Every structure is written in structure tokens, then in C-alpha cells.
Amino acid sequence: MSRIGWCLAMLSFIAAEPAFAWGNQGHMAMGLIAYDRLAAHDTAAISAIEALIAQHPDRARFDSLLAGLEGSERERRLFELIARWPDDIRATRWNHTHWHHQLRVVVGWKAFRGPRLGEADSAFRRNLDILRDFLAKPADRAIALCWVFHIVGDMHQPLHAGHRQDKYFPLTDFAGTKGWVRRSADAAPERFHHFWDTPADRPGDEFAGAAAIAAAADRPFVAPPSGDALADYRLWVAESERVAAEDAYPDAMGAEGDRPEKAGVLAPEYVERARLIGEKRIGEAGERLADLLAALFPAN
């Protein structure tokens, strides 16, 4: 198959299988981590973000979920909701399916490892530009803010940056959305992508789960921002590609089936390692998001 034919086939997959990155809990945990970092060092950014979201065209959605909350509790919840908003509006006019990923083949065949499919890179740049433009409509800047939050989270999920292509998945497994696994012998089959969206999720209430992830998330030292947000973003994506290639796929390829009835069982050690990786990537995303927001909304 030619590269053009392969790209066209992949685009049809992308249209048919929208991919989520992290579950709500993961995105919300990232928002909490970013909020806590800003609350300790850059409270002006929090106030500016609150004021901007007040101009959001989907403000009613936020207001309904913030009802009864005040002070820091309300602010923390707002950051959770901003981070997940692009997933909440999948069925609305604000949806952009291709903004959630930028995929490259990282394991298997080498012939097609060059092309990167998706629009996350251009969407991140576009929304940063809108957010930085103080002459833009406040409603547009508020939407852009939500997408900046979300894309930072999305692109820390390894299967939103890298996927598999080999004889078992000749058109790729499209970041695991075409592959099936089971977390344990008695678990139901799930898409491999879904497994990597939710490795750190807790059972029960998603807000409680997000708080638990944020509390447990590994927050290693992250390099200070370079001053070039796009260059920093490209480094984060490269990290996710490496995690996909070195951690997500190698020990799971034998378990990944191409339909539910062929879903293999992931080793318990793999499931636990995925949880730790998920918590680490969510922690890194939250810390980096806080740095980015502090730069975007400096104190006067």
C-alpha cells in the first residue's frame, strides 16, 4: 500500500473511532494538580481564568456543576471542569474529533513511521494564539482555554501519540481503539486504548476518584518551561511516543486481539505498572499546565 493510500485508510479509521485521552478522572486530576500549584504561587492566574470562563458560551454547563460551591472548593472544581470540557461537548458544535491526538507508528513495521495523523499539534498552536490575543472575543478565548487544558492532558497519554502497525494490525491498531484486552481473567474485554485512558481511575464517584489520583500522582521534578510553549509541547509528545514504544506496547502486544472474543489477559504486573505510569503522566501534565497558565496569565 502506498503512503497516500495508507493515510487515506487511516483517516477513515480516525473518523469512525474517536479516541478519548484519560477518562474524566485523569483530566480532572490534572486540573486539580494545576490548580494547587497555581494556588501556592500564582493566584492571579486563577482569578484571570475564573473571569474568562465567565464569558464562555457554554457557561450554563459550568454553572450547573458549580452550584452550591464557594471559594477554593469552587475554584478547584472549575479547573476540573475546564480540563474535561472538550470531552463533555463531543455531541455539540464545539467538538473537534481530530484535536485529541497526533499519532505516529512507534512499534512494528517501520515503513510508515514518518506520518503523524491527527490535529493536536496544530490545535494546540491555534488555541494558544487565540488565548494570547487580547483583542479576540472573550467567548473564543474561553473556548481556547479549555482546549489548551485538554490537549496538554491528551498528549501526555501515550496512546494519543503512538500506536502499533504489524501483520496483526496492518492498518495500525489506531492507538488501541481497534485492539481488545482484559485487565484480569474475569474482566470483560475492553479496547486497549480505553485501558490506557483509565489505568489510574478509581471506582465510584468520579470527583472523588480524581481527587484520589491527584493526591497519589507522582509529581517528579519537571524542567522549567523554556519560554517557547510549542517547543515544550513537542517534548511532551516525544515523551509520550517513547512511553508508548517502550512501556505500553511491548508487554501487551501478545494480549491485544483484533476483536473482543480474542482479547487476551494483561499480566497483573503490567496493569500495576500502567497505573503508576498513568499517575506519573497525569502528575507531569498538571505541573506543566500550571507553568503554562502562569505564563499566559501573569500577575500585573
What are these model-predicted stretches?
Residues F20-I151, P158-N300:
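N-terminal, motif-rich segments that launch catalysis or mediate targeting to/interaction with membranes
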Residues A16-P18:
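N-terminal signal peptide c-region/cleavage motif recognized by signal peptidases
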Residues M1-C7:
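Bacterial N-terminal signal peptides that target proteins for export
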